[in-house]
Amino acid sequence: MLLTDECPRYEVDTLSAARPAAPVDPVNVEPKEWVYEQYDQLVLSRTVRRPGLDAAVLRLRPSWRGLAVSLDGPPLGERDPFAAGVQAVLDAARNVACAGGEPLALTDCLNFGNPEKPEIGWELGRAIDGIAAAAEALQVPVVSGNVSLYNETDGRAIPPTPVVGCVGLVPDVREVPRGWSPGDAVLLAESDGTLVGDAGLIRFVWQAAPRLSLAHDVSDGGLELALTEASAWSGHEFRAEGSARLGSIVIACAPEHKDGLGWPHLRALGEVA
């Protein structure tokens, strides 16, 4: 039995506030470097991979092990708060995996309006259910969290915004993917679209990371933006036509490693020139 099993459960009035699908706001895919670059990225000189693509990595001296750290909150809350909770967890875990880390723990921050209003109570409950479903699929615990409620202006609530942080263990920071190089094969790793499939893809990527030169998840903006971001990070441009579902992962490796990766859902995109 866990201590949380004896915690009281609060029942609030709820009212579905589902909204029709809407296109992604272009503002959401603009670079955010101007925000996080204001903060010290080299605390105690342990940073071996700076933020900017998926997750940052800190070395755990004196060993060569490291911590991969990521924070994510996809802008899906107004459309579907359950999906927002699910994707916040999966995005954060994918980011950690792309940096070579095994996701080990989650923390959340739930930002909502007044939960005493039935529609806000419904949004909050659905987001929590989404976080729980994804965490269970990953078998990764939510070990902490906080809430920011009653966020309203003139009676109008902020969009439901679940944010999730993930930390993971990197076995050897010397094997963290650094960026693709000319001649590398670029592939798209996909899942079957289920939570179990997404969890399996995340496991595959962090286990394969020592053989990869780069891994980067497909999120807001689709495949084109993912390739653009990976190109900028690596310093070598690569483009490919096509589309990819949310949660797919672009990976790159030396050609001799391509056939031995062992994931059943791989699609070749090309080779870095």
Task: Please place each PLM-identified region on the residue numbering.
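Glycine-/charge-enriched secondary-structure boundary and capping motifs
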Residues: 1-24, 124-162, 202-273
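Glycine-rich phosphate/pyrophosphate-binding loop regions near the starts of catalytic domains
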Residues: 25-192, 240-242
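Well-ordered alpha-helical segments embedded in enzymatic catalytic cores
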Residues: 84, 88-92, 200-204, 226
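Short, Lys/Arg- and Gly-enriched loop/turn segments at beta-strand edges
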Residues: 192-198
